[in-house]
Amino acid sequence: MRLGITAALTDLDVAPDRVAAAVEARGFDSFWVPEHTHLPVREDEPPALVEGVRLDDYKRCLDPVVALSSAAAVTTRIGLGTGILLAAQHDPIVLAKQVATLDHLSHGRITLGVGFGWNVTEARDHGVDPERRWHVVREHLAAMEALWSEEQAEYHGEFVDFGPSWSWPKPVQQPRVRTLVGGGARESVLTAIVAFADGWIPIGGGGLSEAIPRLHGLAERAGRDPADLDIVPFGTIADRAKLEHYSLLGIDEVVLRVRAGPEEDVLGQLDALAPLVPFAATLEQP
């Protein structure tokens, strides 16, 4: 089993390149950062704060592509991922260029974790109808894959429409950068994974014993091999029993959360988690 690290870094915290270098030095396999473009001030719509998440994590979130660019410059081995990027809120042509460039410069180490977002006001500020953001994300990703994989790409949809175009660089990974959908175990999320992604980031990681067979059933009915879908529990508890449980479910990649903060604090958390790396490496899937 491979272990990754995620941290909701802000401009008040240790820089992402410092964390990424420390993650790689301690033997972890990946480094992930989240995204919020902005946090609308709405008294009737407070942020969906969860345990261990600060308001500043939403208000002062770093741009994930820029943050991972700095991480790519100081690492050579670890995977680098967005967890998660709000794809509906981006121009897909620009995002395709950014992600392809990042995959090119990192020599194929990028995972694009995408989601649909909980903050409907944030989505509306980007001109996205929250009720239709699933459809927007699907079109954006399809258009991006065309730009990534075709010499002369074009896409004609409801939300994205462009004629034959050249766009380079192409990502190292083909036909697309590894793409995972983040979210709960709702049928709509699982259907989206099967339709246009390479796997699932189950936020929180609960209920997987029931959800994984459902996902695999949807994949089989759609003509996809369930073994081709990665399942990457995200922000999970750093617990050996939990990792053993995931291994028995056939999961071979887990992302642990550390609290963002000053460099000394974050590196101390990584030191405390580092013994899990060799332990996880001994876990075998059934």
Residue ranges: model-predicted function:
Residues 1-286:
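Active-site-adjacent structural elements that line small-molecule/cofactor binding pockets in enzymes
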